[in-house]
Amino acid sequence: MRDTDFVARLHRNIVLLGSQLKTRFKDHVVLSTSLALFAALLLVIPFYGCSPAASENAQGSSTAQTEAQKDQKETAPEGTVKATSFYSPTLGLDWNYDVYLPADYESNPDKTYPVVYMLHGLYGNHRNLLERFDSSAMLDEAIQTAGQGAIVVFVDGFNSFYIDSADRGLKMESAIMNDLVPYIESTYRVSKDRRDHAIGGISMGGYGAARFVLHHSDYFSKGILLSPSVWTTLADDNFIYTSQHAFSDGTTSWSWDLYKQLFPTQYLGEVDPSQVSFFVATTSDDGVVPVADVDAFVEQLKNAGINVDYQRDSGDNHNWKYWSRVAPTAYAWALDQFKSADSK
């Protein structure tokens, strides 16, 4: 209904009702006129706004909502996370780990999958990357997008820095390579192709993952390093000197010399640079591992001819908020790398 039609209808109703009311209220002209106007408005106002244009707008809005619903992505198929353990001869204990199996794992009994080992940070455990942020949901989405599945193992590394401690500490590096990796391969359908083997981690775990790729490149080909603890220097009052013992040399809790001897880049000479690659992410606002230290580490990798996808941004800090922001991209990178390797 157009505005001119509305006015005409309003006028007709006022005149009609005015005449009727004047007949009944002859001595109250003002009252009758007011009542007529009020009644007319009550009659026609409900119809105002139900014009073809308004109706079309409502219909268009409904259509847009329907189309938007159609465009929404289907919920990604959910993988399965199993919490379990096995006995590690190297560590001399029942060793906890979690494993993520892609949604199609059980329905494809003859299929093998790439594997990613994920390492937690200092003071953490194997549950961190599943509880502090939802790695399972992230992997579901990444797998759906990439069209590439993977088995992901969440390792309990204690506070070991994932090395073989020189002074009565854990032999974590040996435990992973000699106990965990063979056990995972015998228990789950892991691809034997080294191009399908990746390892990643946050903070201390990023340091460990870098060492495994460079020191064990015969098995690992890809590394995911999120805020890796690759310090070039530490302030004299840094808490690490007194609170950690992984790099103890028997005389001090933290031996800077031992840390340097085991630093990941010490193994660059063992690596064919064309056979390994890294995803590295950090923020310039990191207050634990200075971005300059990560820059220097990445530069060493690149100078050695290694392919590095380096994502440096700002905001957040050395914390779960930052890692939850970059982890989906890291997982997607690994899956894309696996898919690319399979196509060659």
Locations of regions flagged by a protein language model:
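C-terminal motif of bacterial Sec signal peptides marking the signal peptidase cleavage site
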Residues: 48-49
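Sec-dependent N-terminal signal peptides
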Residues: 16, 27-41
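Enrichment for repetitive, rod-forming helical segments
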Residues: 16-19, 33, 127, 192
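N-terminal secretory signal peptides that target proteins for export/translocation
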Residues: 1-27
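Low-complexity, intrinsically disordered segments with a bias for serine/threonine
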Residues: 23, 36-38, 65
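Intrinsically disordered, low-complexity segments enriched in glycine/proline and serine/threonine
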Residues: 23-25, 29, 59-62
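Non-catalytic cap/lid and distal C-terminal segments of serine-dependent acyl enzymes
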Residues: 52-344
